[in-house]
C-alpha cells in the first residue's frame, strides 16, 4: 500500500493488561503488518474501570480478544451479539494445583476442600468440572495473587498454566512439590480460550478490514515464533509503559506456552480456526451450568463463527 494511501482505523481491545499473551499483536503493529494491510490499528488495553467487553459494547473498540466460554456465554445469557472471527488458542490452559504434602492426589479428593478462584471471571469451567466430578467444594474468590495458596489459606488454586503456575514455581516451590490437574485431560473440558470477536454490525459493515486484521495478526504470531526475544522486548516495553511489574523469565514462559496453545497439535484444524466440536463442548458446559428454568438464547455454530483466517 502506498505511503499516502488512506488507512482504516481499527481499535483492538485485548482482554487483559499488557503481557506476553498478546505478543502477536504488538509484533504485528511494530513490524508494520497492520499498516501493510491498510489498517491503522490502535491497541486499547482494559482498565480497572473498563473491561474489553465494555470497550467493545460502547464502541470504543471494534475487536476484542476473549475466551470462547466467556464470549459464548455473553452472547447466550446477556444477548450481546458477538461474532467469533478467529480462534487463536486451540486448547485449555486452566488447571488446579495442590501441594503434594496435602495428599490431594486425585481430582475427586478436592471434595470438601477450599479452592481459590479469580473473582474476575474464569469460574464457569472450574465449577462445571467440580459438578461433573460430584465434588462439593468451597470456591474462595481472589483477585490477582498466589499468596493465599502459598500460605496454606486454601487447599487448591485455579491457575493458568502459562501464568500463575509459573509464578508459583518462581516463588520457590519445586514442581515436585505440586500436584497438577489439567482441565485438558478431562473429557469435555479441553475448551479453547483466546479468540477474536466483534459485534454483528461491525461484521456486516467492516468485513474486509476484519479479514485484514485477522490475517495480519496471524502473521504477527508467526513472526513471534522465529523472533521470541524481539517479541519479549516489545512485551516488556509495553508493561513498563503501563507501570506493570514484570519478570522477563516469566514473560518468556508465558510466550512459549501461548505459542503451544496456538498450535493445533493433533487436532484437525488450521491455525486461527474454530472446530464445531469445540464450540459444542463449550455450549454443553454453559447449558449444564444454566440455572434451572433460566431463559437462554439459542445459537447455531455458523451464526456465531464467521472466520477470516486463511
Language model region names:
Residues 27, 94-104, 191-208:
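A bilobed periplasmic-binding-protein/Venus flytrap-type ligand-binding module shared by bacterial periplasmic
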Residues 205-288:
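Secondary-structure end/capping motifs
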Residues 1-9, 310:
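Short, low-complexity disordered leader/linker segments with a strong preference
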Residues 277-310:
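Conserved C-terminal helix/tail region of periplasmic/extracytoplasmic solute-binding proteins
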Residues 29, 37-38, 60, 65-68, ...:
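Sec/Tat-exported extracytoplasmic proteins
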Residues 6-142, 146-159:
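Short, glycine-/small- and polar/acidic-enriched structural segments
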Residues 136-139, 175-180, 241-257, 291-300:
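Short, surface-exposed acidic
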Amino acid at each position: 500500500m502506498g505511503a499516502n494511501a488512506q488507512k482504516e482505523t481499527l481499535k483492538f481491545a485485548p482482554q487483559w493488561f499488557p503481557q506476553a499473551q498478546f505478543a502477536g499483536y504488538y509484533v504485528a503493529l511494530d513490524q508494520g503488518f497492520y499498516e501493510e494491510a491498510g489498517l491503522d490499528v490502535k491497541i486499547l488495553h482494559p482498565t480497572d474501570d473498563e473491561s474489553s467487553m465494555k470497550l467493545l459494547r460502547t464502541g470504543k473498540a471494534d475487536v476484542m480478544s476473549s475466551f470462547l466460554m466467556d464470549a459464548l456465554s455473553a452472547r447466550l445469557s446477556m444477548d450481546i451479539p458477538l461474532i467469533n472471527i478467529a480462534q487463536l488458542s486451540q486448547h485449555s490452559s486452566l488447571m488446579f494445583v495442590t501441594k503434594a504434602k496435602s495428599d490431594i492426589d486425585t481430582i475427586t479428593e478436592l471434595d470438601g476442600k477450599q479452592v481459590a478462584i479469580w473473582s474476575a471471571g474464569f469460574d464457569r469451567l472450574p465449577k462445571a468440572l467440580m459438578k461433573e466430578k460430584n465434588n462439593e467444594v468451597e470456591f474462595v474468590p481472589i483477585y490477582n495473587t498466589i499468596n493465599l495458596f502459598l500460605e496454606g489459606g486454601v487447599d487448591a488454586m485455579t491457575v493458568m498454566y502459562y501464568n500463575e503456575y509459573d509464578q508459583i514455581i518462581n516463588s520457590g516451590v519445586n514442581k515436585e512439590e505440586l500436584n497438577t490437574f489439567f482441565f485438558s485431560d478431562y473429557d469435555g473440558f479441553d475448551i479453547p480460550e483466546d479468540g477474536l470477536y466483534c459485534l454483528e454490525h461491525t461484521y456486516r459493515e467492516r468485513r474486509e478490514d476484519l479479514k485484514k486484521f485477522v490475517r495480519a495478526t496471524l502473521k504477527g504470531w508467526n513472526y513471534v515464533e522465529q523472533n521470541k526475544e524481539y517479541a519479549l522486548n516489545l512485551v516488556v516495553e509495553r508493561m513498563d509503559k503501563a507501570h506493570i511489574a514484570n519478570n522477563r523469565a516469566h514473560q518468556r514462559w508465558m510466550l512459549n506456552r501461548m505459542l503451544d496453545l496456538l498450535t493445533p497439535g493433533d487436532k484437525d484444524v488450521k491455525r486461527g480456526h474454530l472446530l464445531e466440536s469445540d464450540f459444542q463442548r463449550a455450549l454443553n458446559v454453559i447449558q449444564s451450568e444454566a440455572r434451572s428454568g433460566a431463559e437462554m438464547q439459542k445459537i447455531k455454530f455458523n451464526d456465531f463463527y464467521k472466520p477470516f483466517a486463511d
